């Protein structure tokens, strides 16, 4: 019985953790749509938006070039 409780808890935890990371779409002023893995972070000091692309590469874009950020 305890074995089933552990398995059910592990599966529930896996679903809870996987639901926390959403993908976002950034629309740029020149018409590009950038898909991100997780929420982009805006640095007010530098004016850059940091994000990870769909392949997992760390990228940055100037905040002035982004028109909107939408959760997917």
UniProtKB/Swiss-Prot annotation:
One of its GO terms (cellular component) is plasma membrane. InterPro entries: LSM_dom_sf, YgdI/YgdR-like, YgdI/YgdR-like_SH3-like. It holds the Pfam family DUF903. Transmembrane segments: none annotated. Its main location: membrane. It comes from the Bacteria. This is Uncharacterized lipoprotein YgdR. The gene is ygdR. Residues 1-19 form the signal peptide. To E.coli YgdI. Disulfide bonds: none annotated. The keyword Signal applies. It is a lipid-anchor. The lineage of its organism: Bacteria, Pseudomonadati, Pseudomonadota, Gammaproteobacteria, Enterobacterales. It comes from Escherichia coli (strain K12). A lipid is attached at residue 20 (N-palmitoyl cysteine). Keywords: Cell membrane, Lipoprotein, Membrane, Palmitate, Signal. It is found in: Cell membrane. A lipid is attached at residue 20 (S-diacylglycerol cysteine).
């Amino acid at each position: 019985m305890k074995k089933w409780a552990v398995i059910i808890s592990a599966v529930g935890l896996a679903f809870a953790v996987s639901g926390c990371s959403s993908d976002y779409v950034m629309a740029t002023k020149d018409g590009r749509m950038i898909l991100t893995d997780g929420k982009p972070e805006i640095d007010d000091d530098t004016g850059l938006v940091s994000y990870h692309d769909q392949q997992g590469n760390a990228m940055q874009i100037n905040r002035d070039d982004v028109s909107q950020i939408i959760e997917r």
